[in-house]
């Protein structure tokens, strides 16, 4: 079966989110997301946290290892935070910890089963932070060779777990990107064009975001295959608007209670320009940090519900607009479908 036929026709029929008028493409049978327990339709996603973390290990690619922590301890520490998020209405949790920083697909599956929450993991390599988290072969292999590694995880699963990634996670520092960071972005685009997985890029600044977008589109991927992660770090709102107007996803995903007013202002600006459908919101919270006693201080996943949603209501955002932000947008962003330049189905 051809890869496009598999992606577009082999998935279960989509179930529209209740009370929402979805984009036309969501009515097609290709609207599916890959979780650690297998594929589900977008109608099963519910409220989504599109950028969070369960476990991280900042030791570096040369020393990171699952032997540095006890999975049972991490499970016991983190499960109550997921249960708290579940009580607040979260149905789907996107874990953005990549390989070489502590990605543990088996742990995520255990937590998914115990919490009743859908969880999504990733493939890809993280080139930010001075490229501390890259394996040596990231410098010697071509973009095509790196993409082959990531595509293999989509086809065969991560390690011996059988668990498949639901998106691509990579990362870069500020503009200008290094040669290796540019290669990672190209590898991500090549992987997308073979798998339909969306590309989440930790991004140092707005000019780096536009550089990423140029690489992706030059490689043949459409802008809506790309998420500008940590866009809140860029103070120039014009760059947010430029990326959104191009069709990319602009993610304000470092929510703290003290930043709520800034997030409301960002969303109000997008709404005024009819670009609310390009926004993603999350906390970048958690996590169990390997090497710290008891995993260190864990930040809960609930400020969105306790702080941001009440502020959005006060600012005049309707129920439909809030569902757009926390259900429809992440469902569209995560849906597995190949988005080619000049053939984007985004509406």
What are these regions (language model features)?
Residues 110-113, 118-195, 242, 249, ...:
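Active-site gating/metal-coordination segments in enzymes
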Residues 1-7:
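Twin-arginine (Tat) signal peptide motif
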Residues 51, 93, 192, 250, ...:
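Divalent metal-coordination and catalytic microenvironments
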Residues 106-108, 178-183, 207-220, 237-244, ...:
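Distinct, well-ordered alpha-helical segments
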Residues 7-22, 26, 31-37, 302-347:
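Mid-to-C-terminal alpha-helical segments outside catalytic/metal-binding sites
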Residues 46-50, 60-118, 144-163:
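Alpha-helical scaffold segments that flank or form the walls of functional sites
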Residues 253-254, 275-298:
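Short acidic/histidine-rich active-site segments
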């Amino acid at each position: 079966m051809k890869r496009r036929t598999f992606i577009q026709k082999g998935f279960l029929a989509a179930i529209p989110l209740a009370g929402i008028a979805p984009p036309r493409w969501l009515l097609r049978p290709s609207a599916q997301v890959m979780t650690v327990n297998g594929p589900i339709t977008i109608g099963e996603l519910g409220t989504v946290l599109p950028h969070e973390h369960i476990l991280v290990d900042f030791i570096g690619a040369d020393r990171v290892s699952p032997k540095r922590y006890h999975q049972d301890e991490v499970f016991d520490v983190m499960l109550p935070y997921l249960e708290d998020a579940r009580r607040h209405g979260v149905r789907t949790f996107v874990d953005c910890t990549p390989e070489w920083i502590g990605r543990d697909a088996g742990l995520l599956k255990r937590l998914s089963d115990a919490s009743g929450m859908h969880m999504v993991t990733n493939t890809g390599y993280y080139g930010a932070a001075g490229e501390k988290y890259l394996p040596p072969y990231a410098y010697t292999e071509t973009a095509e060779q790196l993409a082959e590694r990531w595509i293999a995880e989509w086809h065969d699963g991560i390690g011996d777990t059988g668990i498949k990634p639901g998106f691509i996670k990579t990362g870069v520092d500020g503009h200008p990107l290094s040669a290796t960071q540019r290669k990672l972005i190209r590898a991500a685009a090549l992987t997308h064009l073979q798998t339909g997985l969306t590309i989440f890029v930790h991004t140092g600044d707005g000019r780096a975001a536009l550089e990423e977008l140029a690489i992706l589109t030059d490689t043949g991927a459409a802008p809506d295959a790309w998420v500008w992660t940590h866009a809140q770090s860029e103070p120039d709102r014009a760059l947010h608007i430029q990326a959104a107007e191009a069709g990319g996803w602009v993610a304000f995903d470092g929510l703290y209670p003290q930043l709520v007013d800034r997030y409301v202002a960002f969303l109000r600006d997008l709404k005024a320009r009819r670009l609310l459908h390009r926004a993603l919101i999350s906390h970048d919270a958690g996590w169990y940090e390997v090497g710290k006693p008891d995993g260190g201080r864990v930040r809960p996943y609930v400020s969105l519900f306790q702080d941001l949603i009440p502020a959005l209501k006060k600012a005049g955002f309707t129920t439909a607009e809030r569902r757009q932000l926390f259900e429809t947008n992440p469902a569209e962003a995560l849906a597995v479908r190949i988005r080619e330049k000049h053939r984007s189905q985004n509406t």
